[in-house]
Amino acid sequence: MKAWSALGRLARVSPWLAPAIALAGFVLAFPIAKVVQYSFTDRTTFLDGQFVGLQNYGELLGDELFWRSLRNNLILMLSVPLSILLALVVTGVLYRGIRGSRIYELLIFVPFLPAVASIAVIFLYVLGNDGPLNELLRGAGADSLARGWLTESSTAIWAVLGVVLWKRIGFTVLLFSARMASIDRSLFDAAAVDGASWARTYWQVAVPQMRSIIGFAAVLGFIEAFSWTFAYVVILTRGGPDRSTFTLEYMLYRLQFDDQLVGLASAVAVFMLLAALAVAAYRVRLARREAFA
């Protein structure tokens, strides 16, 4: 009976949903389907190409640059747990009741406002050989620590990670602050009456109630670190030195526009799409489990 009732409701709303579904299908489904199709061909920019089956995927799996790019994406994903942990600490300090907390919150959020390209250009100067960071180290007598942060293979990807992390923290603090504002203050008052410290109250009372927003921040961060890092890499390092900062997104760009290998670039795009969908699906599964817990 419930099934028939659900079908009846679906039949009533279908005419209203149809235009939106059709638009989404045209804007999203059709391009995705074409990319998947191209990934099974040896298509180039100027030639339609022939069906080659899984050859492109096999070539990727055997390419050392693909694995290096994937490793770099995983390194950039460290920005997710780090930004969440730092944002939790900052949010706890701000809501401790320090004077001027709103001003500090605004200042922390400011790095998120400029475009990624603007942030990357700023750090291109800050992390340069003669930039403020190295000058500060030299002025402090730590000349041995001064280096080309973006021009040495051993430090370049970690420097990019630092820039990504610096930009993400402000947004994450904003999310957590909004959730904190909706938590019943009587819970904190009751804990204070029981003699609990603010730190203990925050981590044992507030943080558990922020699980949903933490999960949202994690999913968004993972997808960003996996698929939205192109601007950081292309401005800060252009994939160098010696391709040490290639990411999957930058590899896709080079395959598509420099090498004209549309089929191989499409295979990279499909891999990235599947990875993003897997993360999102895992989060949805956790959310459902929490809802029925």
Residue positions per predicted region:
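Short, Lys/Arg-rich, polar N-terminal cytosolic tail immediately upstream
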Residues: 1-9
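A structural signal for multi-pass alpha-helical bundles of membrane permease subunits
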Residues: 9-293
